[in-house]
């Protein structure tokens, strides 16, 4: 039984009486015995309640049974393991290699009434774990469970904070450390392997135990894929070969900031003129209210009827052409829902394009003092119709891009055209929404010219979402939901295969006592100058927040930092091209390039921008200096030219001079040195 088949030379399977071990390229993946089984199965009834994208999830667990007995046999492709407990409780595990040589584990409960799986993967106490999509509170996931379910990210996201308590009291919206728009059942271990689960059901990846990782799935089957590499860079190349990679960004992205403006054509023109006349480099105007405004108690929201509102934006079509001639793009907004009181929803309903309720009627979701229909993207005709809405109403208008928002709100009790349970489709929905946008660009020949950016994601978003943004941060300094949280979000996505990430400059969520300060906006601007894209947002209550044109000092700050950003254009373009070619992310954890430095594995608030720039954003209020860690190398402080060799260092960090270092040996060193004179 120990002899591997020719196509499984990287696998080592050893059986001893009623126990076995499975190694893959010298990594222990599974270990099983009667006393320590690797598999449990059971049955449960999901109790999932949604209110405005915030989910209460409970499992009415009926049984959970350890499968202690294992009978092993060889199959044409590898090994077959029949797990059981007694005569009528069993499951089958097929161990093989896929067509690319990856380890493939295919598990099926033999009784389909057993719709729960708990599989334990072997681990070492010293392992670090990264990934699971976009995680805002933790980068190293070891020591905690991470439920995987796409939803709103929460307001506060920390049950110990007052803001979270306030949001929970209002509409169960506070969230917790694991709430995310972009969960994905993919993780990377410091044993230099990745594990990806093909399923899209509700899952919980628990990394709490020292000797194993327990993966729980609310389904009767599971498919897992593993691949190993000698370096993390090579491992990410393999992971993105499986999941897909983002195309390169349009060239105009690197030419300045995208200004988030609302209020109409002339307001956009006036603010654009103000900023450009003061020397601000502007690449675009992003007007999310292009389709109209709906005022709610939450604040100013968009009218979800995806067509140009000529009352609010008169002569927008001709103005877009004018702005384009001046090197300024116009970006809009869309999401996969249609407001029930508008004509696009009526059109979709007439053609049967909306998801259904139990009685066969159109399922209308309450989105916050208004209702909307869910365009059923599993219906090929509805999918094609929505692509045409994008092509006709946005691309033909001349939009250079848009926010493709939402995707997390698919109710689990709706009925879909493809017949698959909405509970299973829920996590898959954001990638389906991304694919709809991607194909609209691909079919019009605009891929690489037009950019859409998303907050929600899942397996497949790596290929189909051209850019991610971090969603709705609070306009505050909190670690779990403020400026700081964007860095672990970007790094965890990087380790999940998506290498293009940015955030709303200044944050978004303006509730309770939170109001964006001038200092926060300027610090966020500093940080964003060292990301792949600079873009502002007014927030949900613009009048409460400090804005980019708040005073002359703020405008001058944007002029300087957009000059910094545009100066880095050739360097950023090269990093983005490498991401498209090999899956090496633009914003990188330090250990990708400093594997032997143990300290780099626990850093979550600093990153490498490309290979040669190290950034440690100031994320605390009132600071004038900052302490950070430099791995051993020849580093130069970007603003003073002072040389550093490595270790913990403290530097002056006034607003406008964030802690940024570059490698003295970089081929781009002369370009980086020029930042000092800006």
UniProtKB/Swiss-Prot annotation:
Record's protein name: Sulfoquinovosidase
Q: Which GO terms describe its biological process?
A: 6-sulfoquinovose(1-) catabolic process to glycerone phosphate and 3-sulfolactaldehyde; carbohydrate metabolic process
Q: Name one GO molecular function term.
A: carbohydrate binding
The source organism is Escherichia coli (strain K12)
Q: Which family does it belong to?
A: Belongs to the glycosyl hydrolase 31 family.
Substituting residue 301 to Q results in:
13-fold decrease in substrate affinity and 4600-fold decrease in catalytic activity
Q: What positions does the entry give for a 6-sulfo-alpha-D-quinovosyldiacylglycerol binding?
A: 288, 301-302, 304, 537
Which of the seven top EC classes does this enzyme belong to?
hydrolase
Entry's transmembrane regions:
none
Q: Domain annotation text?
A: Structural analysis revealed the molecular coevolution of catalytically important amino acid pairs directly involved in substrate recognition, as well as structurally important pairs distal to the active site.
The active site annotation covers: 405, 408, 472
Reported function: Catalyzes the hydrolysis of sulfoquinovosyl diacylglycerides (SQDG) to sulfoquinovose (SQ), which is then degraded by E.coli through the SQ Embden-Meyerhof-Parnas (SQ-EMP) sulfoglycolysis pathway as a source of carbon and sulfur. Therefore, is likely involved in the utilization of the sulfoquinovose headgroup found in ubiquitous plant sulfolipids. Is also able to hydrolyze simple sulfoquinovosides such as sulfoquinovosyl glycerol (SQGro).
Q: What induces it?
A: Induced during growth with sulfoquinovose.
Which PANTHER family does this entry report, sorted A to Z?
SULFOQUINOVOSIDASE
Disulphide-bonded residues? none
Write out the entry's keywords from A to Z.
Answer: Glycosidase, Hydrolase
């Amino acid at each position: 039984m120990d002899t591997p088949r020719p196509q499984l030379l990287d696998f080592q399977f050893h059986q001893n009486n009623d126990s076995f071990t499975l190694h893959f390229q010298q990594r222990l993946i599974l270990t099983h015995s009667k006393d320590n089984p690797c598999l449990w199965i059971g049955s449960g009834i999901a109790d999932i309640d949604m209110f405005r994208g915030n989910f209460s999830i409970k499992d009415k667990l009926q049984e959970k049974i350890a499968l202690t007995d294992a009978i092993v046999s060889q199959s044409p492709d590898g090994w077959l393991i029949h797990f059981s407990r007694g005569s009528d409780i069993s499951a089958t595990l097929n161990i093989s290699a896929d067509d690319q040589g990856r380890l493939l584990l295919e598990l099926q409960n033999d009784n389909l009434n057993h719709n729960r799986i708990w599989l334990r993967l072997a681990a070492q106490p010293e392992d670090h774990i990264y990934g699971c999509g976009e995680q805002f509170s933790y980068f190293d996931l070891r020591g905690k469970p991470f439920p995987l379910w796409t939803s709103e990210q929460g307001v506060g996201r920390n049950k110990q904070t007052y803001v979270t308590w306030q949001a929970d009291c209002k509409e169960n919206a506070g969230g917790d450390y694991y709430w995310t728009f972009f969960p994905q059942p993919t993780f990377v271990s410091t044993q230099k392997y990745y594990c990806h689960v093909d399923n899209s059901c509700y899952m919980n990846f628990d990394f709490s135990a020292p000797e194993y990782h327990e993966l729980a799935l609310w389904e009767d089957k599971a498919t897992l894929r593993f691949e190993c590499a000698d370096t993390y860079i090579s491992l990410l190349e393999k992971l993105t070969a499986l999941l897909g990679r983002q195309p390169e960004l349009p060239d105009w992205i690197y030419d300045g900031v995208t200004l988030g403006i609302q209020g109409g054509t002339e307001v956009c023109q006036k603010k654009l003129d103000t900023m450009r006349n003061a020397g601000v480099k502007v690449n675009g105007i992003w007007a999310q209210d292009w389709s109209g405004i709906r005022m709610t108690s939450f604040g100013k929201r968009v009218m979800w009827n995806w067509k140009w509102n000529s009352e609010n934006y008169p002569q927008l079509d001709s103005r877009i052409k004018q702005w384009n001639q001046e090197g300024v793009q116009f970006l809009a907004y869309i999401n996969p829902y249609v407001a029930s009181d508008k004509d696009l929803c009526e059109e979709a309903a007439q053609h049967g394009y909306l998801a259904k309720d139990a009685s066969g009627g159109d399922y209308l979701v309450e989105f916050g003092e208004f209702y909307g229909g869910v365009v059923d993207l599993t219906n090929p005709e509805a999918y094609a119709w929505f692509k045409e809405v994008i092509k006709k109403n946005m691309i033909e208008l001349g939009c250079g891009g848009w926010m493709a928002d939402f995707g997390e709100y698919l109710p689990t009790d709706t009925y879909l055209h493809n017949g698959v349970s909405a509970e299973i489709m829920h996590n898959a929905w954001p990638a389906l929404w991304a694919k709809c946008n991607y194909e609209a660009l691909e079919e019009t020949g605009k891929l690489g010219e037009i950019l859409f950016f998303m907050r929600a994601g899942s397996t497949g978003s790596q290929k189909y979402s051209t850019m991610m943004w971090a969603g709705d941060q609070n306009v505050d300094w909190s670690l779990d939901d403020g400026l700081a949280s964007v860095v672990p979000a970007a790094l965890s996505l990087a380790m999940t295969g998506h290498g293009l990430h940015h955030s709303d400059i200044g944050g978004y969520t303006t509730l309770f006592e939170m109001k964006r300060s001038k200092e926060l906006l300027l610090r966020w601007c500093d940080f964003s100058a060292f990301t792949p894209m600079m873009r502002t947002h007014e927030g949900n209550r613009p009048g409460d927040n400090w804005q980019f044109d708040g005073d002359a000092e703020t405008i001058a700050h944007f002029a300087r930092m957009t000059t910094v950003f545009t100066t880095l254009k050739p360097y950023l373009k090269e990093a983005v091209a490498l991401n498209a070619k090999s899956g090496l992310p633009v914003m990188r954890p330090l250990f990708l390039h400093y594997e032997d430095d143990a300290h780099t594995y626990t850093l979550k608030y600093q990153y490498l921008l490309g290979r040669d720039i190290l950034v440690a954003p100031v994320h605390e209020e009132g600071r004038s200096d900052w302490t950070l860690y430099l791995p051993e190398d020849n580093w130069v402080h970007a603003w003073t030219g002072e040389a550093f060799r490595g270790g913990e260092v403290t530097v002056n960090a006034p607003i406008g001079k964030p802690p940024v270092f570059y490698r003295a040996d970089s081929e781009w060193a002369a370009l980086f040195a020029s930042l000092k004179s800006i």
